[in-house]
């Protein structure tokens, strides 16, 4: 029997998961039904079509969310961590670097990750915009103010990110529970008035709708998918809450409320087809509009906050895995290490979100842009999951195809339907994704070229030390720590120091930081020290992509291996690389110029590794790529 403490902890995590994980999918009822029957799609609002659409949505929630994500994908975790970056790292570790699948998996996973950024721009825009559009249902007087109010809410949201969400975050769960309870109650009220909508629970109506409408049904799928936006968040947030609380939050709270509300909106439209302009806000009558606008705006802000936090987390992982340059990362909570803030990402994302709101102008126009990013990410997740099941878990090929093939067909159908919107807004997330994909691949390849250049000119460290101590230089008091990459040979900073100062500290440590394709490396495994002789040491510090790099903390860990450091007697020598584009070799020249610009604006190693600035000596070196 579970102890009371474990039960209360599970309940608290489940409540928190309701607030963070299900904000995006929880706000989908604001706009999904409205979009399916919009005039642009040409789908007639008949009882038969209505039953078919509601059946598609309910069974989509069962198949895509309950079966695919909650049952299957949550099992494919990278040491407890989820998200497409973690899944990509897991899939890549399932095959060898020489495998024909390695590069395609890298490209696919990376593009899926960049589409998440496109999704993270549209989610705040469409969620807040559709919530505030409820004012227009009450009176057309508010029409000119919808976009300005949306922009004001979003600017306010991004402006407070630096303060963190630790204080208000505890209210996210209770507010979203109220939101889901409201969805359920509204649904039940309308189902009671038109119980025939319950026929939609029979999947025959979904299949009959697809068969009877063919092309129109295919177009409608592009809007039906809006009901499943945010499904990826179940997987992405697994590391914060664990699989069990996420499953409980889905089956006990989110899924029943969503299913009831979609059935309720269907019941409303059976009775009042004219409510199709905005069925969500007309479920309880005119008296409820203003309270619903207030509650839905809070829910939309929470959904947006979860997406913004997810963007920060994804960026931190991308930096650690070598796909983005180092950036300034601030920790906004003393107790929760996952609470981070990245200023550059925050303000850039805010600018793009505001542009999207002003440029598209309505949730209907934004909805066209939404589906492509979501369905493409779903598709990539399914493919990566197949490789994990097949090559890491070593399951039988037929079993792997059976477990993912069905979902692959559904994902391809939804993605194909959304590709019809390519010229009606779908280009927007694809453009964002393509730009970020190019930047990430360019940075990754650029770092490889820098590494190859340094390795080509590297002097083997042990040979150099052996020759150096034949006629040793003057030793001065203190400890010198030289940062060096893997297989770099003698650090350039050391060569410069010996060349100009002609001295060597009495103790010399060569420090190499390694990033592993796992979320976390425990502190007991982070530091390894090798004696090189003559008071010289090689110190290897290993982190996972969700660990916080902290060299002073690593030096404290070195005490357990007999190496103690006094910070005021320790100097860190770091080579500051100036990268120069070379038209003869490497990447295309335009990519080299992009890489050079990214290198110039990258955060310094000292800041990134939290090394005290007053203990750092930087020495310049030029590298051609």
Curated annotation (Swiss-Prot):
Q: Which Pfam families match?
A: K_trans, K_trans_C
UniProt GO cellular component terms: plasma membrane
Q: Which residues cross the membrane?
A: 10-30, 50-70, 102-122, 142-162, 172-192, 215-235, 250-270, 284-304, 340-360, 369-389, 397-417, 422-442
Q: What does this protein do?
A: Transport of potassium into the cell. Likely operates as a K(+):H(+) symporter.
Q: Which GO terms describe its molecular function?
A: potassium ion transmembrane transporter activity; symporter activity
> Which protein, by its recorded name, is this?
Probable potassium transport system protein Kup
Asked if the record carries the keyword Ion transport, the reply is yes
Q: Where in the cell is it found?
A: Cell inner membrane
Which membrane topology term applies here? Multi-pass membrane protein
Read off the lineage from the record: Bacteria, Pseudomonadati, Pseudomonadota, Betaproteobacteria, Burkholderiales
- Name of the encoding gene: kup
Query: What domain of life does the native source organism fall in?
Result: Bacteria
Q: Using the record, list the residue span of the signal peptide; answer none if the entry has no such feature.
A: none
**Family to which this protein belongs:** Belongs to the HAK/KUP transporter (TC 2.A.72) family.
